[in-house]
Amino acid sequence: MASIGSLYFVPWILVKAWILPLPDTVQEQVNEAIGHGFDGMIIYVDEAGKPPAFYAGGWNNRENKIPANPKSLFKIASISKLYVAVSVTKLVKEKRLSFDKTLADYFPELVGKIENAEEITLKMMVQHRSGIPNFTDNPAYWENEQENGKKPLEFVFNLPASFEPDKGYEYSNTNYYLLCEIIDEVLGYSHQQYIKERILVPLELNNTFFSINDINLDDVMSGYYVGIEKDFKANEYGMLATAEDVGIFLRALNDGSVFNEGEQEIYPYEYEHGGLVIGYQSLAEYHEDIDTVVVQFINTTDFNGYEWNLSEIVINRIVKIIRDNKST
C-alpha cells in the first residue's frame, strides 16, 4: 500500500483511477476508463466454463464518431513476440533451430557489428538476456520510424552491449527482429507463413493478420496519440488481430494446446504480454487463480505521459471485478 507521502509523486489521474470505488461490472469499468481520457477501448474476457464476453467503450473512429466495436482489428505490437517464441520452440523441437546455437552461427556477418555475437544464444534472445541494445530506444529511430522500421539493425550496429550475454535482462525489440530473420533464413520462407501454418490455422484464428496490406483498413480500430489529431491506422506496425483471436491464442498457450508433444517443456518465454506502438496499447493476461483470459485494447497512447500506467490500473480493476463476481 502506498503511503500518503508517496502519493505526492504520483499524477492525480493515476491516483484517481486507483482509489475510485470499484464498479460492479466490467462495462462500468470500461465506461469509467473512457472518462479518464482514452478515446476507445475493447475488452475480451474468457472465463473457463462461460461463453466469452465482449465489452467496448468510446470511439472506434473519433473524427467520424463511430463507436468502438469489440470485433475490430487492432495492432497488437509486442504481443506478437509470443507467436514468435512459440514458433522458435516448435522449430527447436523439429531440430531446425537450436536454443544453444549463437547469433554468429546463423549470421556470421554480424560478428563485429553486434557485440558478443559469438556468445549470444537463441535462448538468450528469446528471454531478452542477450545484452543487444533495443533499436527503439535510439531517438534517431523515431525521426522517421516508418522508413527506419525496414532497417532497424542500423540503429544498434557498433553500439556497446548493455551487459554480458546471460548476465542480465533488458527488454529489446532487436532480439525478436533477429529471431524472425533467423527463422526466415533457416526455413527459406517467411516466419509469417510458418506462424500461419503452425499456429493460426490449427487454432482457427481467422482474424489475425501480419500487415495492414492483408486487410481492409475499415476493419481496423483507429489509433491516436495525445495532442495529435492524426489517425495512425494507416501506419504499418506488423500483426493485427481481434481481441477474441488474441484471447483464444493466449488460452491455448496457457493450457498447452498450442504445443505439440515435447514443446511446452522446452518453451522458454512468457505466457502473457503487452504491446505498445503509436496509437495502440494492448495487454493480454491469463489469471490462473480464476482460470480467466483478459485482453484489453486501448487506442490512445502518449509515450511521455501516463496512458500505459493508466491502462495497467484499468485491467487490474477489471480482473478484480471478475474475481469478486466469481466469489459472490
Say what each PLM segment does.
Residues 115-283:
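Short, surface-exposed loop or secondary-structure junction motifs
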